[in-house]
Amino acid sequence: MMRLAVNTYFFGILVSLILMGCSSGSEVNTGDNEFKNGNFKSAVAGYSENLKTKPNDYHLYYGRGRSYQELGKLVEAQADFERALALEPTNFQALLGMSNLQLERKNYASALLYATKAEEIPGAPALASLLKGRALHQIGLPEEALKAYGIAIQLDKNFGQAYFNRALLKIALKRNKQACEDFKLAMVLEYPGAEESFQKYCN
């Protein structure tokens, strides 16, 4: 259930990032439309077609990489994210995509590197700090992970997943009272799994 909730959240926010970064101004290309509708194979085809005429458009590589990721083609996804970053090294979309991908592949040090780079870019979303927190947690640096989750919450007070992840980490650290406060906040924000976790750990 936790993995489903996390993936659903990432899908939603990364769709938003794709549409925010549309390469053709107000016009959304075929790949973006197909990705938004969950048609990932068609999205790959759409992005590939656009790349024939716009081979240096980092947004198209990022979008195709996200589509490959949703199809479980992680090698192809990483290659496209790397192409996007070669064209635009400070693009936080591609950095977040790489961080998320490395978390999925359990390459936590690499995930931390990309998340940290994204976090340092002005205007980067709270997701960068969340991914940094997840990587730090997996590496075994819980206090640093708590700080990263806290930064994510400072950037976005309505970030249910940040409260939820911080609560789970606090449970692991036996700080149940603090964890329950975070579960409550995640519940108010209707984050999936928060109510069940509150019932499990706080009653």
Tell me the role of every PLM-derived stretch.
Residues 60, 94, 128, 162, ...:
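TPR alpha-solenoid repeat register
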Residues 63, 70, 97, 131, ...:
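Canonical tetratricopeptide repeat
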Residues 172-203:
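Terminal, low-structured helical/coil segments at or just beyond the last alpha-helical repeat
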